[in-house]
Amino acid sequence: MAATVKRFLPNDFFIYQLTAITDSSAYDDTVRLDNRPDNRLVPPKIYAYIAQITDAVEVGFFVEKTAYTQDIFDKQTKNVLMQRADYLWQSECFECFLAQKYSSHYIETNLAINGCYNIYRFDGYRTPNQMPPLADTQHTLSIRHIAVLDDGYVLTFHIRHHNQALRLGECQFNLTAILYPIIHKAYVAVYYAFKHT
């Protein structure tokens, strides 16, 4: 029997290499990670994809294995919680912003390395302006365990709507990540996105 290969339509699958930026002047190419003389801080490469799967959307991140990422992933993947939590962006976090095209309403999904997650609902850009943001109850997130590869880590999750199919071709989105390496003895946020705004 021949294998069935799914044929993707142009709006069914997108993959990006995320670009790293920081708002800190402490970050430059001479900085060394955690004072390790042999390990200059070069931001790990992160690739992200978003794909249509039946009635849901799949989001995945590949994080390059470096001394820094190996340290954080190996520590946190041992204690996977798989529960909702707020303020995940204050530590290493992977995010997907998803909205219907031509709509100001959107959801923000957050996933931490330890399995904590959340989905927030916004009526417009950061509206309502409250902390923590309003939890979204119309979507669910199903998370796969983090895959450990020779050269990196893969985080994957699915976003589903309770009452209707999500169609990626009808959506606008942004995939982002935040890592917090130690630079000059302080945690510094490094922001990743394929589209920084």
Locate predicted features:
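Beta-strand secondary-structure signal
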Residues: 47-49, 58-62, 95, 154-158, ...
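Extracellular/luminal beta-rich ligand-recognition
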Residues: 82-146
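Beta-strand elements of well-folded, non-transmembrane domains
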Residues: 52, 63-67, 100, 159-163, ...
